[in-house]
């Protein structure tokens, strides 16, 4: 897999419906842009990029609400993939902090419980204590520009398909 190879394929990964930002439980996934010379590697990378594009959709909702986001955090299995970390950083044009913790949802729940029972005053305080960053991936301007163009095409797929579900 290569981030620099020009691919035309992408995926809308709504395999179990879509929740954010399109609340449509009937939405389904689709590969778009396949051709006879599409490879398994192309499809694999399209899946990784499609998930990152979906994350970007949610990021854009937050930005439209005036929320300023300069970096994001990832953990778990996907965070072990150097390729996927780079894809997320470049699609979102954000610094990506990789956390040491493997089980993010469980850790998040435990952190919220600790705040709720008064062991910590707020989420920021416990986050600084518990969410250890082990790596940071920076976006690369050349790839950010490439992915911006691809993301704009990706955004057009859902409106074009929504009446077909």
Language-model region placement:
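A short acidic, often aromatic-flanked loop/helix-cap motif at beta-alpha or helix-coil junctions
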Residues: 17-19, 40, 104-105, 144
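Catalytic phosphate/nucleotide-handling subdomain of diverse soluble enzymes
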Residues: 46, 54-141
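Adenine-nucleotide phosphate-binding core of ATP-dependent small-molecule kinases
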Residues: 34-55
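N-terminal glycine/serine-rich phosphate-binding loop of ATP-dependent small-molecule kinases
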Residues: 38, 92-96, 149, 164-165
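Single conserved hydrophobic/aromatic residue that forms the stacking wall/gate
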Residues: 1-10
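A mobile "lid/hinge" subdomain adjacent to the ATP/sugar-phosphate binding pocket shared
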Residues: 12-39
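Charge-patterned, long linear interaction tracts outside catalytic cores
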Residues: 144-165
């Amino acid at each position: 897999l290569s981030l620099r190879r020009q691919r035309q394929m992408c995926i809308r990964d709504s395999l179990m419906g879509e929740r954010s930002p399109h609340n449509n439980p009937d939405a389904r996934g689709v590969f778009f842009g396949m051709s006879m010379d599409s490879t398994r590697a192309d499809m694999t990378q399209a899946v990784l990029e499609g998930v990152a594009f979906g994350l970007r959709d949610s990021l854009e909702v937050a930005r439209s609400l005036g929320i300023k986001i300069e970096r994001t955090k990832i953990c778990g299995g996907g965070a072990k993939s150097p390729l996927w970390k780079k894809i997320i950083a470049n699609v979102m044009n954000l610094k990506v902090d990789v956390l040491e913790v493997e089980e993010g949802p469980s850790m998040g729940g435990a952190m919220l419980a600790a705040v709720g029972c008064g062991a910590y005053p707020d989420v920021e305080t416990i986050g600084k204590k518990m969410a250890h960053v082990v790596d940071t991936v920076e976006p690369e301007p050349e790839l950010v520009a490439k992915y911006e163009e691809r993301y704009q095409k990706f955004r057009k797929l859902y409106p074009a398909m929504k009446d077909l579900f």
